[in-house]
Amino acid sequence: MERLIKLAEQIKDEELRKKVIEFLKNPKATHPGIVDTGISVEEAPASINWHHRYEGGLIEHTISVTKIALKMADVLEEVYGVEVNRDYIIAGALLHDIMKPYNYIRKEDGTFDHYDMFNLDHLTLAVAELYKRDFPIEVIKIVASHHGDHSPTRPNSIEAYIVHYADEADSKINDVAVRVCQARSRDLGISEQEIYKAVNPLKVYEVRSREGKLKTIEFLKDILKSIGIISEDEKKDENNESLENKESN
């Protein structure tokens, strides 16, 4: 959470900065009908079946989206000479998924799932809470439209498009990475979540894209062995089996 607050402190407008920091520190739904599932922003994944689907994924995704969006703002100003409101970008990016924890529960095995009693979706909850907390309409529109054409309202400002495409870029690249981790977890006969405890999925994808499948398996075995997730005997058995596999994924 401190990393999110540090980004929020870059907001120049004092009133907006205070509102964003307060929301980050107290991301609770005001309406009494919204069920608190007990999942914090710090522990929540960013999704269940897609990108950042591991503990801490939501914060990781939020930081990345905010930083990507600010870099995009730099490029658009430098190349096209437009003025971009960075305060709105930071606020919208930091808060775009802030209510996702209300859609998740933690299962007995420690993994996450959707809350089956169904709170409102995270976008609806966020927009409602932003209205309740009297945020600027420009920030509300950024959050409301961050899914682009799949949002209830489409982006209608440079800032809204920046946040939307920053969100999409980070989501897409992480989704590719977690699918590689999913495949390698099957190769290793372990839970996909065990990989995420040991190494960031983008690092796994980096190894996969540069060195191939077999090197990725070896990379993961070494890391997993070092933290006790697999034993030396398991590593030897898997080494022998891997040598028989063809480079196919």
UniProtKB/Swiss-Prot annotation:
Gene3D superfamilies: Hypothetical protein af1432 (1.10.3210.10). NCBIfam families: HDIG. Its EC number is 3.1.4.56. Keywords: Hydrolase, Iron, Metal-binding, Zinc. Optimum pH is 7.5 with bis-pNPP as substrate. It holds the Pfam family HD. This is Dihydroneopterin 2',3'-cyclic phosphate phosphodiesterase. Pathway: Cofactor biosynthesis; 5,6,7,8-tetrahydromethanopterin biosynthesis.
